[in-house]
Curated annotation (Swiss-Prot):
InterPro entries: Glycosyl_transferase_4, PNAcMuramoyl-5peptid_Trfase, PNAcMuramoyl-5peptid_Trfase_CS
Organism listed in the record: Haemophilus ducreyi (strain 35000HP / ATCC 700724)
Gene: mraY
KW Transcription (keyword) present: no
UniProt name for this protein: Phospho-N-acetylmuramoyl-pentapeptide-transferase
Tagged with keyword Cell membrane: yes
Localization (cell): Cell inner membrane
Predominant cellular place of this UniProt entry's protein: membrane
Length: 360
């Protein structure tokens, strides 16, 4: 929005040209989202406490989690508000990639909100009926995937980028829609599964999204794209603003979510953040790189799949409890140790992922 005002005021003072730079707006989007999160955090937490929107805890989980029962949840609302206001202020709203991201972010946020509300209303951890939850997640993902494909059909925007190979960029055709669907829905659910400990999901999300801010800038800059042998995609540079808005909102939320947490993001936060991260990875054509940098999310999701599959086939469990962070807790690891070690692993994976951009 501010881009429009700056363009109008440019004829009066050339200093307003600074707003045209993605780097400037990215920094401002981060600071704005973080400031909003820090400001509204206490208000949101207080309101959630008044409404008795407290966390429900599984009875078969680690005993250390019982003290978390009643901690305000649905704090993802403050994340969505922070991202929404910041991106509307600093992103160029004429850019369709901005709207694709916002559509998935808030669409998944609504699904997560309903899921959280049902958990609170029923006083259990089941939430929204699974088939309806995945129906709406799939419906939103398919709309986004089809729209993105229609806009970028048979261009660099629908090529598959393979790490380490600069010449291997096949056109995906209609398979683009299927791949985009699985990346968006899969990432959303993986982040949701990771969100089981204080700060465990938000910090890896911040790290991976910060890396994608750099990737988005490079993909939208023809010279940087040529240097890194990645496809140049015209509209993708603006996604850097969306990424830094997510980073800023995440930092603002982390202020209140760090151990011991004053608030949990709930599904309204984890589903929306995961969905946004997935759609950004699709738009900059780095789905495979997301698997590397978001390795913690991948392992968390795989641990659940393997646990369920093993129990159905063999009536035996592989882990003491899934997702895998609970397995380490039941082995005797203190919660902060699990959290920080997963953060460290994510940092290493993000750095490895960024290095692969040059190793082609």
């Amino acid at each position: 929005m501010l881009v429009w005002f700056a363009e109008y005021l440019l004829k009066y003072n050339t200093a307003f040209n600074v707003v045209s730079y993605i780097s400037f707006r990215s920094i401002m989007a981060l600071l704005t989202a973080m400031a909003i999160g820090l400001w509204i955090g206490p208000k949101v937490i207080n309101r959630l406490q008044i409404l008795k929107f407290g966390q429900e805890v599984r009875n078969d989980g680690p005993e250390s989690h019982f003290k978390k029962r009643g901690t305000p949840t649905m704090g993802g609302i403050m994340i969505l508000v922070s991202i929404g206001v910041s991106s509307l202020l600093w992103a160029d709203l004429r850019n369709p990639y901005v709207w694709f991201t916002l559509f998935v972010l808030f669409g998944y946020g609504i699904v997560g909100f309903v899921d959280d509300y049902w958990k609170i209303a029923r006083k259990n951890t089941d939430g929204l009926v699974a088939r309806w939850k995945y129906f709406w997640l799939s419906f939103i993902a398919f709309i986004a995937a089809f729209s993105m494909y229609a806009m970028g059909k048979d261009t660099a925007a629908t090529q598959l980028v393979v790490p380490f190979f600069k010449e291997v960029m096949p056109q995906l055709g209609l398979f683009y829609i299927i791949l985009a669907y699985f990346v968006i829905v899969g990432t959303s659910n993986a982040v949701n599964l990771t969100d089981g400990l204080d700060g465990l999901a938000i910090v890896p999300t911040i790290m991976v999204t910060a890396a994608f801010a750099l990737i988005a800038w490079a993909t939208g800059n023809i010279h940087a794209a040529e240097y890194l042998y990645i496809p140049y995609i015209r509209h993708s540079g603006e996604l850097a603003i969306m990424c830094t808005a997510i980073v800023g909102a995440g930092l603002g939320f982390l202020w209140y979510n760090t151990y011991p947490a004053q608030v949990f993001m709930g599904d309204v936060g984890s589903l929306s953040l995961g969905g946004a991260l997935g759609v950004i990875a699709v738009l900059v054509r780095q789905e495979l790189l997301l698997l590397v940098m978001g390795g913690v999310f991948v392992v968390e999701a795989l641990s659940v799949i393997l646990q369920v599959g093993s129990y159905k086939l063999r009536q035996k469990r592989i882990f003491r409890m899934a997702p895998i962070h609970h397995h380490f807790e039941l082995k005797g690891w203190p919660e902060p140790r699990v959290i920080v070690r997963f953060w460290i692993i994510t940092l290493v994976l993000v750095l490895v992922g960024l290095v692969t951009l040059k190793l082609r």
